From Swiss-Prot:
GO terms for biological process: tRNA methylation; tRNA wobble uridine modification. Its cofactor is FAD. The lineage of its organism: Bacteria, Pseudomonadati, Pseudomonadota, Alphaproteobacteria, Hyphomicrobiales. GO terms for cellular component: cytosol. One of its GO terms (molecular function) is flavin adenine dinucleotide binding. NAD-binding protein involved in the addition of a carboxymethylaminomethyl (cmnm) group at the wobble position (U34) of certain tRNAs, forming tRNA-cmnm(5)s(2)U34. This is tRNA uridine 5-carboxymethylaminomethyl modification enzyme MnmG.
């Protein structure tokens, strides 16, 4: 019997499930990962890439918490690039194309090497619920696995339905059956469900592409890893092809637009705004004479090519026709047609910031089930849900990511307070404090928190504390070195002759002075500082003026996040609150004052009233203790 008893059970072995299971096990919870097949753990169902704008920040944050995605991407990455590298550090996004096979095998190896983590092959059919709390998972073969905390990471499998033209196939992804039982379970629990859609392009045979006739894009000269624990990238790097659709392409698609599952009315679900199908592009941006297509090889020893930019749900024969009108693809052979897939999701406002279902203790949701799109968004939620599931299993306080200190916190707050009307994707523009939430400082922001929670390996603790000490020592050195304007001029630094002494740290905040320039002024002092620390301090100093201005706003936000509202708070009993707000707050059930403040119609007076009542409640609880 003890073989079927766990602290945490994770359902689903995709990007959310892998991170959730790993996170729970790292906290010492005896964890089970349920998946249909062991060899599908870590499968990249759509594009063969990790990271990007906003998404790369999430990967770095997952890594800072000792998660898996960054390290696995460093093993499998075959074209590392830093996006927006000519812009400010706050909006730069690390990205890599990935070898699908290498990524899957590296993720499986990482999961198998994790202590306290068992992989169970099978089909989770229902939840075991006792006295309003999760008690385990009921399998399709009638086995019952016991656990006080369960994480659902079902991806596109909840009543998944694939569309290729008018053809409809129940599936979670190509060749894999959907999950019907769990969708019925969620509906039975009274959770608000919706229907969303995503899509993928046809896969092409790289041997049939005319690579000589199209543009090429290669990796950066300097390969920058995702993980703090990766010293160098050793996997061979490759180029991808770049081409464009043509007027002939557009004509075929427009002539057949009503045969697309999206435009025939066959699909109910809403698709991702920022990853549109080629049909959507032509309907919404019909004035353009072409749309860029990136031809991304799916592996070092795989001839399959992913044509990024032409996701579609047109019939297979129409896909074949329009693909042949794209330069370089005139003779391309389709290995698998593109398709749209629609699936059920849960309104994420049903969740607390720990990603626990408000009305069912012990049930956590992560990934596309919460209305997001993308591997990185799913993995970040999996990390949060896995940590909190482990904490729930031991009756410990939950761990909440703040939107002031992480993109993970921004995403979870957006989801749980605002909900979704379309698949949610992370962008740097979603963060109010993005100048301080940079990809380059994810470790400094989050690893100390991870160390306090206890989900970090000894090896990472040693490496991070050494790096942190080096940063602090070098920062203090920069702040101790100072020059007058005349001394600076003699050293070749052109600053105002105002008689004011400036430290090396002050000078580093000027846009026209680099660490290398200051090293010429103080070669003996600064010449020995390594490039990684030098770059970190250069970026930090450059943003220091702006970050000082933001400090007050961040403190206010953190204070409001810390003022929690009981989930059973009786808004109807709050005299002075309008009936409209009583209804809206009762429906939204905000977790804290920060979430209450963004409820539609909320006023400063209503917030003040709520705060007064919460203080009275807190005082009464203290007096009765």
């Amino acid at each position: 019997m003890t073989d079927n008893v766990f602290d945490v059970i994770v359902i689903g072995g995709g990007h959310a499930g892998s991170e959730a299971a790993s996170a729970a096990a790292r906290l010492g919870a005896k964890t089970a990962l349920i998946t249909h097949r062991r060899d599908t753990i870590g499968v990249m169902s759509c594009n063969p890439a990790i990271g990007g704008l906003g998404k790369g920040h999430l990967v770095r944050e997952i890594d800072a918490m000792d998660g898996l995605m960054g390290r696995v991407a460093d093993v499998a990455g075959i074209q590392f690039r830093m996006l927006n590298k000519k812009k400010g550090a706050a909006v730069r996004g690390p990205r890599t194309q990935a070898d699908r096979k290498l990524y899957r095998l590296a993720m499986l190896a990482a999961i198998e090497a994790t202590p306290d983590l068992d992989i169970i092959e099978g089909d989770a059919f229902d939840l075991d619920v006792v006295d309003g709390c999760v008690a385990g998972v009921i399998m399709k073969d009638d086995r019952t696995l016991k656990a006080p905390a369960v994480v659902l990471t079902t991806g596109t499998f909840l009543r998944g339905l694939i569309h290729i033209g008018s053809e409809k196939t129940p599936a979670g992804r190509v060749g894999e059956a959907p999950s019907i039982g769990l969708s019925a379970t969620l509906a039975r629990l009274g959770l608000r469900l919706g229907r969303l859609k995503t899509g993928t392009p046809a896969r092409l045979d790289g041997k049939t592409i005319d690579w000589q006739s199209i543009g090429r894009q290669g990796a950066d000269e300097e390969l920058i890893p995702f993980s703090f624990m990766t010293d160098t990238i050793t996997t061979r790097q490759i180029e991808c092809g770049v081409t464009r659709t043509t007027e002939a392409t557009h004509r075929i698609i427009v002539d057949n637009i009503m045969r697309s599952a999206m435009y025939s009315g066959q699909i109910e679900g809403v698709g991702p705004r920022y990853c549109p199908s080629i049909e959507d592009k032509l309907v919404k941006f019909g004035e353009r004479d072409g749309h860029q297509v990136f031809l991304e090889p799916e592996g070092l020893d795989d001839d399959t090519v992913y044509p990024n930019g032409i996701s579609t749900s047109l019939p297979a024969e129409v896909q074949a026709d329009f693909i042949k009108t794209i330069p370089g693809l005139e003779a391309a052979r389709i290995l698998q047609p593109g398709y749209a897939i629609e699936y059920d999701h849960v309104d994420p406002r049903e969740l607390t910031p720990s990603l626990e279902v408000k009305r069912l203790r012990g049930l956590f949701l992560a990934g596309q089930i919460n209305g997001t799109t993308g591997y990185e968004e799913a993995a970040a939620q999996g990390l949060a849900a896995g940590l909190n599931a482990a904490l729930r299993s031991s009756d410990s306080d939950p761990f909440h990511f703040s939107r002031t200190s992480s993109y993970i916190g921004v995403m979870i707050d957006d989801l749980t307070s605002r909900g979704v009307t379309e698949p949610y994707r992370m962008f740097t523009s979603r963060a109010e404090y993005r100048l301080s939430l940079r990809a380059d400082n994810a470790d400094m922001r989050l690893t100390p928190l991870a160390m306090r929670v206890g989900c970090v390996s000894d090896a990472r603790v040693r490496r991070f504390t050494s790096y942190q000490a080096e940063i602090e020592t070098c920062r203090a050195l920069l702040q101790s070195l100072a020059v007058t304007p005349n001394e600076a001029r003699r050293a070749g630094l052109n600053i105002n002759l105002d008689g004011q002494r400036r430290t090396a740290y002050d000078l580093l905040s000027y846009p026209n002075y680099s660490f290398a320039a200051l090293s010429d002024v103080w070669p003996e002092k600064l010449g020995m500082i390594g490039p990684k620390v030098a770059e970190a301090l250069e970026i930090e100093a450059g943003y220091s003026v702006y970050l000082d201005r933001q400090a007050s706003a961040i403190a206010d936000q953190q204070r409001d996040e810390e003022r929690q509202i009981p989930l059973d708070f009786n808004y109807d009993a709050l005299a002075g609150l309008s009936n409209e707000l009583k209804v809206k707050l009762g429906t939204a059930r905000p977790f804290n004052i920060a979430q209450a403040a963004i409820v539609e119609g909320m006023t400063p007076a209503a917030i003040a009233l709520l705060l007064v009542h919460l203080r009275r409640l807190s005082s009464a609880e203290r007096n009765s203790a």
